[in-house]
Amino acid sequence: METIAFRMHLHPGKRDEYRRRHDAIWPELADALRAAGISDYWIFLDDDTHHLFAVLKRPADHRIAQLAETDVMRRWWAYMADLMATGPDGRPVEKALEPMFHLE
């Protein structure tokens, strides 16, 4: 199992709405994330910079790349687009983060 982390950007003033939408995550999206191999998924917010930091675990045989091809993922991205920085294809702009320390 591999742990990865990445950064996204939340638009100023959108904190509460971002939390509200994630508190009511669509069951079919949660199922799709799990089916792709994602587990122990956390998203943290730095309120000063509006950066979101996501951390998740995935197995070697994950299918995360295929999520972009699913209807539910595309609908979620469209639903969230007014809250965060997105690319031309509608997906959130993500910056992979390099692990610097781990204590087990």
From Swiss-Prot:
One of its GO terms (molecular function) is L-rhamnose mutarotase activity. Gene3D superfamilies: 3.30.70.100. It is found in: Cytoplasm. GO terms for cellular component: cytoplasm. Involved in the anomeric conversion of L-rhamnose. Belongs to the rhamnose mutarotase family. This is L-rhamnose mutarotase. It comes from Burkholderia cenocepacia (strain HI2424). The lineage of its organism: Bacteria, Pseudomonadati, Pseudomonadota, Betaproteobacteria, Burkholderiales.
